[in-house]
Amino acid sequence: LSQYWGKGDTRSIRSILSIMYRVTLALSLLFTAAARFFPELILSLFSSDPLVIAAGSRYLALVCFSYTLNGMTNVMLMSLRSVGTVGISILVYSSSFFANTALNWVLIFGKLGFPALGMEGAAIATIIARALELTIASVYLFGFEKKIGYTLRDVAVYDRSFAKDFAINVTPVM
């Protein structure tokens, strides 16, 4: 993206972003499905303790719903940083940090009238924090950002030449 920004080619930046959203969506949904339907199998790769696997599976089966939210937010913020807009990342991640911390306190321990949910509460807090991140980043990108000029209409644009270049240049890195 930075090379296109240096050339002032915002059309190409928008095309690449659309491809990145598609790839991120596909991969995050794949990982979400794996974590949702096979949490025990995934955790058994890291631990043989049945108590750890059982507890971790409950958490993983919930927190996996944050993967797509996190992926989309990261694409937005990475693109903004590529064109020199870095302040929004600080706002997004600071807001998320404080929201997640507060929600963890409330949902894990059952404060402010909420039931104590333990690990499930931590997963729910994480999902809410990731939704907050995506909301703030989306409002900024689609409502206030003027350098790239990315709109909701651009999400549907598919440029085959950029898709081919993207696959050639990005696949080895992945």
Each model region followed by its residue ranges:
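Short alpha-helical transmembrane segments in multi-pass integral membrane proteins
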Residues: 1-66, 114-171
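Alpha-helical transmembrane segments of multi-pass membrane transporters/permeases
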Residues: 24, 79-106, 123-127
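Glycan-recognition patch characteristic of GH18 chitinases/ENGases
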Residues: 110
